Amino acid sequence: RGTVKEAESHDADVILKSFDAGKAVFHFDNREVAVPLKLRGIYNIYNAAAALTLTRAVAAERYNKKTLLEALGNVEPAFGRGETLMLNGQPIELVLVKNPSGFRLALESFPPADYATMIAINDNYADGRDMSWLGDVDFESLRELGVAQVTGIRAYDMALRLQYDEVEAAAVSTDIPAALQQFIDSHPDSPKRIYCTYTAMLKL
């Protein structure tokens, strides 16, 4: 308990200082700590900072910092949330997207450099039927390399949205399995990343 003024002036228990692929730096207990992470995406890193804060608050003086950081570093990505699969020696990253803020953060979290990119958009009930939110996503980060494959029920709507941001879509198909195979065959030696809605991900 405390006054509103006291609550407003309370220093953050955990501060996320920086992050990049495979590592985040947090400031807590008056020092900066670099933590190797299996999680990807800034939204997952925010969740990691929240988990550190909650655990320290609940456990108070009883928490073991070494054990806590090791446990955090061993957390695996949830299905499709930055999950990485290996195929023929190359990674395929699955990035679930379901709203404009999530898609924007995903694009910010996963730089397109050196990656072949595919986007799979369905509008089934579990995805949400209204895909107009794609208009609120900035796809300019994909402009330089373009998108290798666009697929899903709303493939042509997605391709049109990319065109508005001057992002080239090399191939467009509503047939997800066929599009996936073409994507893999066309980029055998490249790491790959697929942004997908929920039911599109289940088809991959």
Q: How should each PLM-predicted stretch be described?
A:
Residues 1-100:
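Adenine nucleotide phosphate-binding catalytic loops in nucleotide-utilizing enzymes
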Residues 16, 128-129, 180-184:
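Short, charged, surface-exposed secondary-structure boundary motifs
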Residues 43-44, 98-99, 154-156, 198-202:
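Gly/Ser/Thr-rich loops at beta-strand to alpha-helix junctions
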Residues 47, 51, 148, 194:
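Residue-level signal for inorganic ion chemistry
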Residues 50-53, 57, 105, 109, ...:
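Alpha-helical scaffold segments in soluble metabolic enzymes
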Residues 58, 110-115, 183-191:
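Glycine-rich phosphate-binding loop signature in dinucleotide/nucleotide-binding domains
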Residues 78, 90-91, 96-174:
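Active-site beta-alpha connecting loops in nucleotide-dependent enzymes
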Residues 178-204:
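A glycine-rich beta-strand to alpha-helix segment
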